[in-house]
């Protein structure tokens, strides 16, 4: 399992320019094992999105224990990527296909400018948000639905767009808010789209009923903006 500061990378998945988190970890593993090692992540994160608990697996022989492997890999990584744990997995384990769900959270600051040290890791909304209205909107989105309207349309073709969103809650106090989303899976940019819709509710641009109507329509509208990547964290992968 690893964590990373998404600002430095072009997302999780391997990129032609070699700037993805996957590319950097694979180069490090190549140095450790003296051969090519392909890793398989639990899923993609976009450029600028952070992770606290990204899970990946790879197949390679190692006889020196998990602690030494962790140390060997970590020593070759930049400070913006941390290997948090290493363990031997069952032979049939797959980081993506064995997962039964994921938890993301999104950080918001509202009602003024965010602290400059917080700004790189949150969406700073100038207007003070109506948090109770946002919570009402979140309740209307929770459950098993077709979330096509809350995904990037150019990435949704014949893909099954029905997901079980078991939790969408807003916590925090004062100017700092956290939106936590838990589901059996997420569509491309789904969490950021949900957050964008909830912020629109908080700003008075949408009502909770209108958010539900967008969900039922299955059609994305300009009223649903995609929240900036910098506030999103992959918190945990559930197995």
Predicted stretch roles:
Residues 1-239:
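Structured-RNA-binding interfaces characteristic of tRNA pseudouridine synthases
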